[in-house]
Amino acid sequence: MAREFSLEKTRNIGIMAHVDAGKTTTTERILYYTGKIHKIGETHEGASQMDWMEQEQERGITITSAATTAQWDGHRVNIIDTPGHVDFTIEVQRSLRVLDGAVTVLDAQSGVEPQTETVWRQATEYGVPRIVFANKMDKIGADFLYSVQSLHDRLQANAHPIQLPIGSEDDFRGIIDLIKMKAEIYTNDLGTDILEEDIPAEYVDQANEYREKLVEAVADTDEDLMMKYLEGEEITNEELMAAIRRATINVEFYPVLCGSAFKNKGVQLMLDAVIDYLPSPLDIPAIKGINPDTDEEETRPASDEEPFAALAFKIMTDPFVGRLTFFRVYSGVLNSGSYVLNTSKGKRERIGRILQMHANSRQEIETVYAGDIAAAVGLKDTTTGDSLTDEKSKVILESIEVPEPVIQLMVEPKSKADQDKMGIALQKLAEEDPTFRVETNVETGETVISGMGELHLDVLVDRMKREFKVEANVGAPQVSYRETFRASTQARGFFKRQSGGKGQFGDVWIEFTPNEEGKGFEFENAIVGGVVPREFIPAVEKGLVESMANGVLAGYPMVDVKAKLYDGSYHDVDSSETAFKIAASLALKEAAKSAQPAILEPMMLVTITAPEDNLGDVMGHVTARRGRVDGMEARGNTQVVRAFVPLAEMFGYATVLRSATQGRGTFMMVFDHYEDVPKSVQEEIIKKNSGE
């Protein structure tokens, strides 16, 4: 089957925002106007097309990034609706990795919110071009120009309106297009009847002022336009649009639009902007990867003629078709029934069927082309971030970075029958979500699950009960602490057993030094002259890795330590891998006496929004929880406080804040970094973990 839409006419976009800014409603309207659905589903009524998991419909939030495809103005638009809640950051990250552009949805009353900052930062890291949609213009307190200013103040973004609203709150009735310099007036509730007319007299001065600002801002990014502007020449609409497109694709400029998805206003113009200003796969740099055979960098330009290369960005278990692997095709063509090579795992995989997804309904297709996003059935070994390529033309594409979990819970099955089911359920959920970890405590036999926050684990335990019918008891949440060394030291590990039978002998000298934060464990072999034979070196490293998994103070994993093996000795007969593994673990224990071991705790960036009258209470909460205030901002008669607070002190805070502010205060938190716990807290943790 031939390609239906050319690469120039393909857009892969994400819709991202702070929780509750109206992302899913916006996506719903896009599907409605592009003819994908005939009846609009409201998120707050639990009937949205994109939020198809039961928990999403109950909670009114988006958890998984549903992928869907739509058509607009002769173009194919593949849309990924991403969650706005911080506990589901990985969903945002992995969708940004495979998108070419994004629409950032703001709540026009609140402007840039904490999670907007997080997703904006992630999109900047991945170099994703964006347009901004100031939604909820019909809401009380909606302020378009405040929202635009918040993009400058909080994100330092070169963002400028290409539209202005006509009226706001209940009186929001249309939009001024600053490129055509025309007004679009909505005359019915479905937003399908739009009158284009001259700009109302009372808005002409404002429109001229913002048109001038727009031209100036765009000219700053474009030399040719700047020359025309300075010489006072007329700049045509076509020239202005072309310059906005170039600057947006180069991530130098962000067009800002306005509307109300709920009231069906502004969505079609936003779709036009997706086509006009966001890139096709041909507009962005060709993806790079490493050839596993030569270790050399290779590129894969977006073209059907190139060898097939794709990235798996999400695994999902579908009750009807089983395991689905979502993938983005960067180059080449793939037919169902053919074989590909998973270069990340070195395994050959058969593509059973290829499905094009629409939220949770699906359509089977025979072929996918460069630039497409689809799901495959039948892949057994592929996980998030794996590269799938032509067997004859291997390449490993840059993978998806997975943040470390910060919170853990103990789960135990209620009955023997639940035990086996729970193992399978947890394995499947972990396959779908790389930030969800499942471990078994070797000493107690307990199953411990870890994730990005309480809501994250709540949803997963809930899915285990609903989808896999597993009944389980869940313990109280625990913090994922870490351990490290704060000083350098040298230590010997000597292990000798020679009492009848085959003896054991291992002897090592290791220098331990603190590593940079986030660098993890690094091992260096500095042995000269074979005092420790080469075949035992990996055993020394393995011995250290295994011992570090259980720490030296309270049994927490050790991070950010360098170990340099520089001396030792061996016995011709009695030395073995096991002996050197044990010797290495003894060296670590010995080092702990003088390397100033410390326990680290996750610090959260907490953003608390509360009425001004309650500011004193909020500051008191932060101090009482060992937190430190990082900044404050007044918004009308509310105060926004940003602070770093240990995760251990944040359990149950929602209830405290609610009662202190009569339910008017809210907070968001996102993991920021690890920090040493105070000595008194460290002693308590050690005491608790040694069972005293």
UniProtKB/Swiss-Prot annotation:
Name where it's found.
Answer: Cytoplasm
InterPro entries, sorted: EFG_II, EFG_III, EFG_III/V, EFG_IV, EFG_V, EFG_V-like, EFTu-like_2, G_TR_CS
Decide whether keyword Protein biosynthesis is in the record: yes
Q: Which GO terms describe its molecular function?
A: GTP binding; GTPase activity; translation elongation factor activity
For the biological process aspect of GO, one term held by this record is: ribosome disassembly
Alphabetical GO CC annotations of the entry are: cytoplasm
tr-type G domain sequence ranges: 8-282
Q: Which PROSITE patterns match?
A: G_TR_1, G_TR_2
Binding of GTP: at which residues? 17-24, 81-85, 135-138
User: Pfam families attached here?
Assistant: EFG_C, EFG_III, EFG_IV, GTP_EFTU, GTP_EFTU_D2
Q: Tell me, in a sentence or two, what this protein's role is.
A: Catalyzes the GTP-dependent ribosomal translocation step during translation elongation. During this step, the ribosome changes from the pre-translocational (PRE) to the post-translocational (POST) state as the newly formed A-site-bound peptidyl-tRNA and P-site-bound deacylated tRNA move to the P and E sites, respectively. Catalyzes the coordinated movement of the two tRNA molecules, the mRNA and conformational changes in the ribosome.
- What family is it from? Belongs to the TRAFAC class translation factor GTPase superfamily. Classic translation factor GTPase family. EF-G/EF-2 subfamily.
Name of this chain's protein: Elongation factor G
Starting at the broadest rank, the lineage of the source organism is: Bacteria, Bacillati, Bacillota, Bacilli, Lactobacillales
